[in-house]
Amino acid sequence: HAFLDGRDTPPASAKGFVETLENKMAEIGVGKVASLSGRYYAMDRDNNWDRVEKAYDSLVTGDGIKAESATQALQESYDNGKTDEFVEPTVICKDGQPLSLVKANDSVIFFNFRPDRAREMTRAFCDDKFTGFERKTGFIPLTFVCFKDYDESIPNKKVAFKKEIIKNTFGEFLANHGKKQLRLAETEKYAHVTFFFNGGVEDPNVDEFRLLVNSPK
């Protein structure tokens, strides 16, 4: 089940990626692309649950646009002016039936490290008390594995790579040697030179000064 980017990648690059993937799967004899969905639907982060519901239903109930192949579906979407980010949830079928749907007791691996756009779909699958939309099949028991812990409040999930405590970051090293440091960035990259650069720690080091310059709007 492929979630397409098109914002942090060229807007119509998914077709090439999907073709490469399908060729490799055909070579090794394992796997098929069973559905497509643009990130606008599958990886929303602003509680637009109506979008997430469309992507979820394509995975679970087979509702959505139908296509005979992923590459055909992408080309038709491009022809209709909808590039990767906005590809409507599409179910790949054979003889009129979905190739594969997510069902009870399946194992699912969510191949995404960044949590902000993975939380909503993960919650829709894992939260037995989910209220974002009505799940037509109810709560489905799964072995659902996230690449990292997208949100500690989401139950019934497993985490492949637990958060590591990073010791003696470069900022700590400078502070421990009595050096001053300035972290300077515009709004969009401020977190990168502070929180992320400090190994996921929000508080500044001793003599670490921060200056935020508003990004142009």
Language model segments and positions:
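Feature captures the catalytic ectodomains and active-site-proximal regions of enzymes
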Residues: H1-K217
